[in-house]
Amino acid sequence: MKFRYFYSFPQSASLTAQFIVRLPPAIVCFDSLRDAPPTSEGAFRIGTNLFAKLKFEKEEVMKLKTTLLGKTYIFKDLKEVLAKANEEKTGDKLAGLAAESAQERVAAKVVLAAVLLSDLRENPAVPYEQDEVTRIIQDDVNEKVYEKIRNWTVSDLREWILSEKTSGADIRKLSRGLTSEMVAAVCKLMSNLDLIYAANKITVTAHCNTTIGLPGTLSCRLQPNHTTDDPEGITASTLEGLSFGAGDAVIGLNPVTDSPEQVGKVLRRFQEIKEHWEIPTQICVLAHVTAQMKAVRDGAPCDLIFQSIAGSEAGNAAFGFNAATIQEARDLLLHEGTAEGPNVMYFETGQGSELSSNAHHGTDQVTMEARCYGFARRFQPFLVNTVVGFIGPEYLYDARQVTRAGLEDHFMGKLTGISMGCDCCYTNHMKADQNDIENLASLLTMAGCNYFMGIPHGDDIMLNYQTTGFRETAALREITGKTAIPEFQRWLEKMGFVENGRLTAKAGDGSSLLF
């Protein structure tokens, strides 16, 4: 802890000592009383000049150093502490932000554990005046909740979250007083099992046409991507996925052609399938937000509007939108969309996206990812998922880093209070394989993840990456005793695809849904 003492002096005085710091007129700051010992009169002498005492003030300054095993580690600012407290990530190394050794990483964690939540509030990753994501995060804080916890340390927050006495409802209430930097900080002090245990406490639901995130459910986005956007190919994958029990979260396609006309064409095909078989679900085409808005204005049916988001204003600008665009899209869908709502937005994120567009502001990728969720919360989304390994080994090198990032992102999303899923995936040039992705999906199921992806054989031939297939979600439901969203589960049973919580012999036969 550091103390500062403030005293008055004549504005005409000549003060040249290095320890003197000029403040507003007539104020001088000394870092210790030794710099200007008091006289017997209670005034303070600098050279031959005598000055009367104006005020005494104690200011607590963050202690950003620690000594471990005889070596002292000093960090220049809170941003450096946050970065170096991260578990190893190649993206942070690429940005020049990572700890140089395991010892330095531990030292940063020790320092971070003692940081006050108020220090994190007052030192956002990007200044309030410069960044609308920061403004959204800060303005959305519940001040009454924050005042109760502002003097907690990050360690206090961690212990409280992990306490057996703390319920999920307790965490949801407290989360309204957290900024994204606080969320990221506590995440950095948790082990993988801590992240699973804590996230599993938290239930976050959202409603579009159905309600996702209910206890005892595990949902799946049906992702029928096609290399040429061929309607019949898309339909074939959609029907097959439905027969395996995929699609209760959303039937959502990434189009090859990002045009309003193509968006409308695919949405109409999805709506035709949904209406013919009376399927209780949501539909979406994951084009740019502006293309989807144009399609809706042209009369296309649409339940959810999608956009990839970043943790800074500059990152979102690189994606071609700002907060006003998202608000306009949400308002449009609430008035002209086909969903019940009120949750009609779908966002995707992923550690490292800000660095890829040089929009990270010298901030580590976990903290920037947490800021994505703070931004998303403003717009009350139905779905948010990290596409955890999609960006490649330059940001997450191997299966170990992908697993850690997936658990971090899921925990941070739920702690922020959003309906959180995960695209457990990897690229072909990453040191990971399908077994690693199944491991992550299994861990996230234990953590209470709301949904995964479902793609034929887990191989997205359009986006050229690997993720979970149709059978993975079905298997995880059976193992854990979970089901699809209740209305969708009843539809599966009615259609004969599921019986007693298990897939039937009819599962996988998409031809049974041809019409």
Q: What function would you assign to each model-found segment?
A:
Residues L218-P224, A249-I251, T281-A287, L304-Q307, ...:
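Hydrophobic faces of well-ordered beta-strands that scaffold small-molecule active sites
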Residues L218-G233, S356-D364, Y426-Q434:
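Active-site mouth loops of central-metabolism enzymes
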Residues A198-N209, T257-F270, Q292, N316-A329:
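Active-site-adjacent beta->alpha loops and helix N-cap segments on the catalytic face
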Residues V61-T203:
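Long, compositionally biased, glycine/small-hydrophobic-enriched stretches that function as flexible linkers
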Residues D92-A107, L112-V115, R176-E181, K188, ...:
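Alpha/beta enzyme core
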Residues L174-S175, V186, M190, V250-L267, ...:
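Glycine-rich, proline-tolerant flexible connector loops at the mouths of alpha/beta enzymes
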Residues C220, Q262-A287, E328-A339, T403-M420, ...:
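Alpha-helix-loop-beta-strand connector modules within alpha/beta enzyme cores
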Residues E129-V133, I202-H226, V344-N358, M420-C422:
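N-terminal small/glycine-rich loop or linker at the start of catalytic domains
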